[in-house]
Amino acid sequence: MNTDDKKMIGVIGGMGPHAGIDLVQKIFNQTKAASDQDHLPIAMLSIPHSISDRTEFLLGKSDVNPASAISEVIGTLSKIGACIIGMPCNTAHATPIFNEIIERIPKEVKLVHMINEVSKFIKNKYPSIENVGI
């Protein structure tokens, strides 16, 4: 087994309990696989009670930045081989949270910025579009 065989996708669950499951299902559905063994290795870790409310933090109703707990989940995923991590939570991509996560996680781990990636996709796939509504 070479080192590429040990690499896997990590998914942070627990921020919207079904969001992590939904992301994993979408990855499976988009994977071209003739057998079970052809699927991409994925690990999802969902520890919702450990990650504080993102909105409460951003509104100043809590001093606890959820970045700390999210970073710990990423660290655990990294230890079991995840080298690219998906975080299916829009609120966790807010600058005060996301930037703190980036500062805390291992440098060899790529945390996908979901919003930036969607923006890149739209620009590449639909270059004439100037405005996008959410």
Task: Please give the residue ranges for each predicted region.
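N-terminal glycine-rich anion-binding loop in soluble enzyme alpha/beta folds
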Residues: M1-S68
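Glycine-rich phosphate/diphosphate-binding loops that line cofactor/substrate pockets in enzymes
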Residues: N2-D5, T76-I80, K120-E130
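Conserved beta-strand elements of the Class I
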Residues: G10, E130-I134
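Short, well-ordered alpha-helical microsegments
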Residues: G20, A94-F98, S119-K120
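Short, acidic/small-residue loops that bind anionic groups at enzyme active sites
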Residues: S35-Q37, I101-K123
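A short, well-structured juxtamembrane/interface segment
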Residues: S71-V73, E117-V118
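Helix-enriched interaction subdomains in cytosolic or periplasmic regions
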Residues: V73-K110
